[in-house]
C-alpha cells in the first residue's frame, strides 16, 4: 500500500442545513468554554496561589492565539471535523487521525469532567453529601441520563444555550461589580501576586506557577465546538470569526474579574483545597452579603451550563466520529445508526461508558480529570496551529475568508501569523508538562493514543487503503434523493450460475435485513397445454433452487 492519494465515491444523501448565526455560535462556544471556569478555577488556584489571576491571564493570551487559528481554519474549511479536517488538508489521513483521536479524548473528557463538576454544585441546592461515593455515583447517573437522551434523538438547542449564556454572564458581571465596589482591595491582591518570592504568603514557586498556568489552560478549552458547527453556519466567513471574538473577549474579562474578586473574599489555599470542585459557589458563599442565596443560585446555573456542556461533548463525539468514519479512519460500527431512533447508538454507548470508566478511575479527584483533559485538548490545539502554518507555507494563494493577524512576511507571497507560532509552542509545552509531571494523565493518554493508532492501521489494512494517504471523497448528488428500504428481494434462479448477481442480492439482504425469495421459471411452449408434464425442466429447476 503506497502513501498516495485515493478516491472514494459516496452518494450525497443530505447536506447539513446552514441555520446558525453568530449569536447561536457564540452561545454554543460560551457554553463549552465558559462552563470550564466552574471547575478550572480551583485546580488553577491549587498551584498558582496568589498569582492565579496572572495564570488565567497568560492562559487567556494563549487562548486568543488558538481562537484566531480556529477562526481562520474554520472559515477556510467550513466542514465538520475541526482539527481532524484541518490536519487532513495540511498533511494526510494518518496525521488527521492522530489529531482527531486526541480531540475525541478531549470530547470524552468534556463529558466526564463537566458531569463530574455538577454534584458539588447541586449540594448548595439540595444539601447532598460531598462524599466520593455520592460524587462518582452522581456523575455516572448524569452521563447515563445524557446517553439515553441522545439515544432518543435529543438535539442541542442554540436558543437554550443563548439564554443560559446570557444569564451566566449577567450573574458573573453582577458578582464582579458588587464585590468590586464593596469588597475589592487591589493593593492587597497585588501584594500577593508575587511569584518565587520566599517568605511571602500565597507566593508560588516558578515551577508551581507554570503548573498553575498549565491548569488554567483547562479553563479555555472548548473552542473546538464552534469549528464542529462550521457546516451548519450561515455566512461562516463572517459568523465564525465574530462569534469567536465575542467569546474570547468576554471570557478574558470575566475570568480575570472573577479570580480577582474571589481572592478578595477567600484565600487561594482554601479555593484550591476546600472548594477545588466548586470554586465559584465557594467564592459567593463567603460574601458578607447575600451569600445564603447567591451560592444556591450559582449552584443552579453552574449545574445547568455544565449539563449542557457535558451533553455537547457527547454530541461532539458523534459528530467527530461520523466525520472520521467518512474517510475510513474508524470502523463502520462507530457511526452505525439505530434502526428506530436514527442516532449513532454504538458510538454514544461506547463513549458514555469510557467517560464513566474515566470518572471511576479518577477516584473522585478533579486533578486527574483536568490532567487528562489537558492531554487531549493540547494535542488538538497543537495540530490546529501546525496545520495553519503548513498550509500558509504550502499554499499561500489559498482563499482564506479570514486571516489571523500579526503576520511575519517571508518573501512576497508567504506570511506566518505570530499568534499561531506562539500557540504552537505554548500548547506543546503544556502537553509536555502533562507528560513529564502527570504520570496518571500521561499513562492513560498514551494508552488511548496507541490503541487508536493500532485500530486505525488494522482497519486501513483491512480496507486496503494507504496508511498515510490522503483519501478524497467524491460525492454524487442525486436530486430529491430518498433512502431505499428493502424488505424482500426476488432472485431469478435461472441466473444462479451468475455468482455476481447472487452476491449482490445477499449483500443487499444483509445490509437491509431483507428476505430473499428464489424463483425458477419454466417456459411452456404455446403448442403444449399449461399442465403438460416437463420432467426434465422441472428436475433442472429443483436442482437450481
Descriptions of predicted regions:
Residues 1-51, 64-68, 76-80, 88-89, ...:
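Membrane-interface "cap" regions at the ends of multi-pass membrane proteins
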Residues 17, 39-142, 247-251, 257:
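Extracellular loop-to-transmembrane helix junctions
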Residues 92, 124-128, 196, 243-311, ...:
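TM-loop-TM module centered on a large, flexible mid-protein loop between adjacent transmembrane helices
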Residues 135-188, 244-248, 370-384, 439-453:
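Membrane-interface loop-to-helix entry segments
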Residues 160, 333-343, 381-434:
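C-terminal membrane-solvent junction of multi-pass transporters and transport-like membrane proteins
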Residues 372-377, 409-467:
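A generic transmembrane alpha-helix motif of multi-pass inner-membrane proteins
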Amino acid at each position: 500500500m503506497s502513501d498516495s492519494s485515493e478516491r472514494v465515491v459516496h452518494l450525497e444523501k443530505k447536506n447539513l442545513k446552514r441555520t446558525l448565526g453568530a449569536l447561536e455560535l457564540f452561545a454554543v462556544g460560551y457554553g463549552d468554554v465558559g462552563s470550564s471556569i466552574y471547575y478550572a478555577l480551583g485546580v488553577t488556584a491549587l498551584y498558582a496561589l496568589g498569582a492565579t489571576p496572572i495564570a488565567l491571564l497568560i492562559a487567556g493570551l494563549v487562548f486568543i492565539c488558538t481562537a484566531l487559528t480556529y477562526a481562520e481554519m474554520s472559515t477556510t474549511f467550513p466542514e465538520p471535523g475541526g482539527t481532524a479536517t484541518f490536519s487532513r488538508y495540511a498533511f494526510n489521513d494518518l496525521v488527521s487521525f492522530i489529531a482527531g483521536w486526541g480531540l475525541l479524548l478531549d470530547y470524552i473528557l468534556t463529558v466526564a469532567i463537566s458531569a463530574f463538576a455538577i454534584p458539588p454544585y447541586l449540594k448548595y441546592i439540595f444539601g447532598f453529601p460531598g462524599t466520593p461515593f455520592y460524587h462518582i455515583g452522581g456523575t455516572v447517573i448524569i452521563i447515563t441520563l445524557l446517553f439515553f437522551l441522545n439515544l432518543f434523538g435529543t438535539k442541542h438547542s442554540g436558543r437554550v444555550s443563548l439564554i443560559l449564556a446570557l444569564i451566566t454572564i449577567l450573574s458573573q458581571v453582577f458578582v464582579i461589580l458588587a464585590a468590586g465596589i464593596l469588597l475589592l482591595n487591589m493593593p492587597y491582591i497585588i501584594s500577593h501576586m508575587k511569584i518565587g518570592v520566599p517568605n511571602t504568603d500565597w507566593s508560588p514557586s516558578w515551577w508551581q506557577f507554570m503548573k498553575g498556568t498549565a491548569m488554567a489552560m483547562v479553563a479555555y478549552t472548548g473552542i473546538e465546538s464552534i469549528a464542529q458547527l462550521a457546516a451548519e453556519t450561515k455566512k461562516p466567513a463572517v459568523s465564525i470569526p465574530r462569534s469567536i471574538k465575542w467569546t474570547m473577549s468576554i471570557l478574558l474579562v470575566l475570568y480575570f474579574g472573577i479570580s480577582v474578586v474571589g481572592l478578595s473574599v477567600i484565600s487561594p489555599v482554601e479555593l484550591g483545597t476546600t472548594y477545588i470542585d466548586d470554586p465559584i459557589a465557594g467564592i459567593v458563599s463567603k460574601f458578607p452579603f447575600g451569600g445564603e442565596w447567591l451560592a444556591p443560585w450559582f449552584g443552579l446555573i453552574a449545574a445547568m451550563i455544565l449539563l449542557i456542556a457535558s451533553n455537547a461533548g457527547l454530541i461532539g463525539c458523534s459528530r467527530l466520529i461520523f466525520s472520521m468514519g467518512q474517510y475510513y479512519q474508524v470502523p463502520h460500527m462507530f457511526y452505525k445508526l439505530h434502526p428506530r431512533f436514527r442516532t449513532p447508538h454504538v458510538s454514544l454507548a461506547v463513549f458514555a461508558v469510557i467517560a464513566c470508566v474515566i470518572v471511576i478511575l479518577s477516584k473522585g479527584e478533579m486533578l486527574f480529570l483536568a490532567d487528562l483533559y489537558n492531554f487531549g485538548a493540547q494535542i488538538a490545539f497543537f495540530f490546529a496551529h501546525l496545520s495553519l502554518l503548513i498550509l500558509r507555507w504550502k499554499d499561500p494563494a489559498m482563499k482564506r475568508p479570514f486571516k489571523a493577524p500579526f503576520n511575519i512576511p517571508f518573501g512576497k507571497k508567504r506570511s506566518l501569523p505570530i499568534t499561531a507560532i506562539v500557540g504552537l509552542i505554548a500548547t506543546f509545552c503544556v502537553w509536555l508538562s502533562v507528560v513529564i509531571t502527570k504520570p496518571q494523565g500521561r499513562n492513560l493518554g498514551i494508552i488511548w493514543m496507541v490503541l487508536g493508532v493500532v485500530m486505525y492501521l488494522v482497519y486501513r489494512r483491512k480496507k486496503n487503503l494507504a496508511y498515510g494517504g490522503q483519501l478524497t471523497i467524491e460525492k454524487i448528488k442525486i436530486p430529491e434523493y430518498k433512502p431505499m428500504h428493502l424488505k424482500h428481494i426476488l432472485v431469478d434462479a435461472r441466473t444462479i450460475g451468475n455468482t455476481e448477481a447472487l452476491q449482490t442480492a445477499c449483500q443487499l439482504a444483509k445490509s437491509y435485513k431483507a428476505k430473499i425469495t428464489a424463483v425458477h421459471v419454466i417456459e411452456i411452449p404455446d403448442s403444449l397445454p399449461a399442465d403438460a408434464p416437463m420432467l426434465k425442466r422441472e428436475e433442472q429447476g429443483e436442482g437450481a433452487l
